[in-house]
């Protein structure tokens, strides 16, 4: 049996840091309130730097390729999860292909599942390795949400940061990704929006979110999907070594960990330093944990994410 196994991880965050103290000067908020309600102390932001969605994706990809110790020429697919591409077209994946000088006989495409984008991309890549003969797939989660937040809206501008994370998935005989599950419900599509497209435009595109409703749904749906994927995989909660959640809100993360019976020390948390980096948050957290020596080869990881759409998903894997 062929598995998709993570061979390398990488990430990138902009240099500029926006702290809660900085936000206190911009909107009516406090460090104490943000920490209690969300769990974010600072976030990295593109601001006026030369960084953008593509450059961050490229830098994260380079680091994943370096860790995987592969020749970039062997990469046979690129999948990018993002909701904040530079352009309507070409895709971010094709721009990454260009900057990495990868060969032309490979598919490269973006998928948009907002904050769940990396889990969606990982699931697609897993199927291509299991069923279509792909050997090395570059999967990236990247977003620049600070470019679409309303900096006068204290309920949303405190949440988000920018960044990118990447993994190299490699075909392997040893267990890697065990299962993935993806769900969506468009009936909730108005709960998180950034309405600037071909048919509907805002003069300045801003992210809008009904926070209380999203919080309740996230706790419920993520709780259900982690139970579902553990059962589908024939495992027990006690088999999970690490939870790597989407870093959206510390209280949502704690609710999921409690449902799994996992102590805080077995949950990878970067929300305090990064904020919500959307599709980048899970691979960013994974990269940080691997490079810190927390997560090791053979550990069982549970990934879960929830975002606009509404779309949510989970992945269970052996590193």
Swiss-Prot record:
Keyword Calcium part of the UniProt annotation: no
Catalytic residues (positions): 115, 246, 276
Positions of the UniProt region annotated as ACP-binding: 247-251
Record bears the keyword Hydrolase: no
Superkingdom of origin: Bacteria
Catalytic function, reaction form: malonyl-[ACP] + acetyl-CoA + H(+) = 3-oxobutanoyl-[ACP] + CO2 + CoA
Enzyme category, top tier: transferase
Subcellular compartments: Cytoplasm
SUPFAM superfamilies registered for this protein in UniProt: Thiolase-like
Any one cellular-component term (Gene Ontology): cytoplasm
Task performed by this protein: Catalyzes the condensation reaction of fatty acid synthesis by the addition to an acyl acceptor of two carbons from malonyl-ACP. Catalyzes the first condensation reaction which initiates fatty acid synthesis and may therefore play a role in governing the total rate of fatty acid production. Possesses both acetoacetyl-ACP synthase and acetyl transacylase activities. Its substrate specificity determines the biosynthesis of branched-chain and/or straight-chain of fatty acids.
Oligomer and partners: Homodimer.
The protein's name: Beta-ketoacyl-[acyl-carrier-protein] synthase III
Species of provenance: Coxiella burnetii (strain CbuG_Q212)
Gene designation: fabH
